Amino acid sequence: MVYVDESGFSKHQPRTHGYSVKGKRCYGKHNWGEKGSTNVIGALLAGALLTVSLFETTINTDIFTAWIKQDLVPKLPQSSVVIMDNAAFHKNQSVKKALEQAGHILLFLPPYSPDLNEIEHKWGEAKSKRRKTQISILDLFPLPCL
């Protein structure tokens, strides 16, 4: 089974904890109005990232469909079962057609069940690592993944 999903990573990951003198509040500086994030689409196979792509734009139907056709399908093992959540652009007919023509099966998770999508845990681990180490997004997902 191959789990597919996307996630957004803020350009800057502010620390969630800090140190101060006992009894004094800890303050930090961060521009919360700052714009910009990197969107990531990835596929998880047997607990490891099969492929990851980074985008400096919003993920939409066209981008997701192109990623499926150009990146994911060529890397999938034969007769894979591809599992996605219910995002509107996941349910596009061209996505289904591309996977089925390549001999794969597409399944959708029940609505509002991110806990069933194993790649969600990988995104959580990546965001946690990024917060703790302040690692760049390019270093977080070195290419190639495998």
Q: Which residues does each predicted region cover?
A:
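Short functional hotspots at interaction and active-site rims
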Residues: 1-146
